[in-house]
A protein has these predicted regions:
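A conserved helix-loop-strand patch within extracytoplasmic ligand-binding domains
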Residues: 103-158
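Short, polar/charged alpha-helical segment
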Residues: 41-60, 172
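Short, well-ordered beta-strand elements
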Residues: 28-42, 59-64, 154-158, 269
């Protein structure tokens, strides 16, 4: 498809949602919009933020706990309606695999750029606990600084839940750091932040998985600098895993029927584009201020009404 026909197709889709003269959109279905929740704060808060916007527009909403990788198949099959935080590095392959089968569409990209990587809290660098950081080669000689009670004298990297990345980090550690390092998997994102608090209190260094945008952007977090990522460098893609993570996009996905069943909600969803500060602030309401995910969403919606209400009007 050339650029001209692509523009024609895009215009045709837009005209099915609203005419340039401001014609009222077809009424959204009363069928609930099903929004998934996963296991990190910004995603759950944003689920309730988006659900709150849909409800303000008069829609019915349901929330379901969903597997972070399997959710794209659920969207394709129509069991889930949308996904609002599709992180390129972790979920890109599952996203595109479901799209290739049919039934899932790309609903746009957030303004925020992402990085999913291991690193250390800023105070580890400030206290020079491992000289040479953030260069990954510094870890080769200071593994003992990152040893914990369950690491057998080896340096420990605390990864997120294994369902997020599979063997990506064990493969990388084996390829670049060797036998003096071990990867342990946290049960949840909350376990990562609890380890940060405990490590600082105990005066020990810690090396954990993290991502940006996140609430830690404000507190300070230093990502390890590995050899540059290139397509196919990971072992799971046929490479040797001697590479770091790519900087990537943050997309939204939807079931292909969503634009027809809920044209107004889909138009609003396609317009939603949150930046790093906005996403980090959603997470901070939970991870720093201690609100529940639902209360955090309510607070965020109240504080940012001008931002989200602009996404819900008719027109281009």
């Amino acid at each position: 498809m050339n650029k001209f026909t692509s523009k024609v197709a895009a215009a045709a889709l837009a005209m099915t949602l609203a005419s340039v003269s401001g014609q009222t959109l077809a009424a959204d279905s009363t069928k609930p919009i099903v929004i998934p929740t996963h296991n990190w704060s910004s995603q759950v808060v944003m689920a309730y933020v988006i659900g709150g916007i849909f409800e303000d527009m008069g829609n019915n909403v349901e929330y379901v706990s969903a597997d972070t990788q399997g959710v794209y198949e659920s969207i394709r099959n129509g069991d889930v309606t949308i996904s609002h935080e599709v992180w390129q590095s972790t979920f890109g392959a599952s996203f595109y695999a479901a799209m290739a089968k049919g039934g899932l569409i790309d609903a746009g990209t957030h303004a925020a750029l992402t990085l999913e990587e291991v690193g250390v809290p800023q105070w580890v660098v400030d206290n020079d606990m491992c000289p040479g950081l953030p260069d990954y080669t510094a870890l080769i000689d200071c593994y003992a600084v990152f040893a914990t009670a369950d690491s057998g004298g080896k340096g420990r990297i605390l990864e997120g839940p294994q369902s997020w990345h599979g063997t990506e980090y064990p493969d990388r550690v084996e390829a670049l750091l060797g036998d003096n390092w071990v990867v342990k998997f946290a049960g949840s994102a909350d376990a990562l932040w609890a380890d940060h608090v405990a490590a600082e209190k105990e005066g020990r260094a810690t090396l954990t998985f993290n991502w940006t945008p996140n609430f830690t952007d404000g507190a300070g977090f230093v990502f390890i600098e590995w050899p540059e990522y290139y397509l196919g460098c990971r072992k799971q893609d046929g490479g040797d895993s001697k590479c770091g993570s790519p900087k990537g996009w943050l997309k939204k996905a939807a079931n292909y029927k969503f634009p027809k069943t809920h044209p107004a909600a889909y138009m609003a969803f396609s317009r939603m584009s949150f930046d790093a500060g906005q996403i980090g602030s959603m997470a901070a309401l939970v991870d720093l201020e201690g609100l529940s995910h639902k209360d955090a969403a309510t607070q965020w919606l109240a504080d940012n009404e001008d931002t989200w209400r602009a996404m819900t009007g008719v027109g281009m």
